[in-house]
Amino acid sequence: MIKVSRKTNETDISVELNLYGMGKASIDTGVPFLDHMLDQVARHGLMDLTIKCDGDIQIDDHHSVEDIGITLGQAFVQAVGDKKGLIRYGYSYVPLDESLSRVVLDLSGRPSLKLNVSFTRAMIGTFDVDLISEFFQGFVNHALVTLHIDNLKGINSHHQAETIFKAFGRALRVAITEDERQEGIPSTKGSL
């Protein structure tokens, strides 16, 4: 179990992460829609995840959402360590009714986010969909992964977001799987 805390003038966040868990989640970010999405990541990634955030949501949700991505990324990079023996690459397609998303990632050590989604609404309830990219950018920058997210089809914005987060959890699950035939670092360079 990896534990990471991050405190700024805007947020106070604690994350506990077990990559090889059972999909148990205890999420309290102060942003209900984000709680729902992170629960999907834990359940579909089969990781145990506890997140507590006290943020300045009286201003808006931006600082909390971005900083949770950062803190989760910091926990993830610690949890995967040197990546020895891991598959390294992961991908998943996830449908939900009319929506279909694909997430592909590489535990490359090279932070890069390519997000291709045209949400059909700017808000999901009180949640600004622009914050989804802020979450993933924070995660990518600190988890040191390359992440491609494509919403291939979708009409309902909630479904679009949910397929993205479910596919993200499933792609992580594949990438961190131990490959019994891979003895060393999964790179011709010898390091990631």
UniProtKB/Swiss-Prot annotation:
Enzyme class label: lyase
Subcellular location per the Swiss-Prot or TrEMBL entry: Cytoplasm
Amino-acid biosynthesis among keywords: yes
CC per GO annotation: cytoplasm
An annotated GO BP: L-histidine biosynthetic process
EC number(s) reported in the record: 4.2.1.19
Keyword flag Lyase: yes
Pathway: Amino-acid biosynthesis; L-histidine biosynthesis; L-histidine from 5-phospho-alpha-D-ribose 1-diphosphate: step 6/9
Broad class of where this protein is predominantly found: cytoplasm
Annotated keywords: Amino-acid biosynthesis, Cytoplasm, Histidine biosynthesis, Lyase
Entry-linked Pfam families: IGPD
UniProt GO molecular function: imidazoleglycerol-phosphate dehydratase activity
Catalysis performed (reactions): D-erythro-1-(imidazol-4-yl)glycerol 3-phosphate = 3-(imidazol-4-yl)-2-oxopropyl phosphate + H2O
Family under the similarity heading: Belongs to the imidazoleglycerol-phosphate dehydratase family.
NCBIfam families: PRK00951.1-1, PRK00951.2-1, PRK00951.2-4
Protein name: Imidazoleglycerol-phosphate dehydratase
Organism of origin: Vesicomyosocius okutanii subsp. Calyptogena okutanii (strain HA)
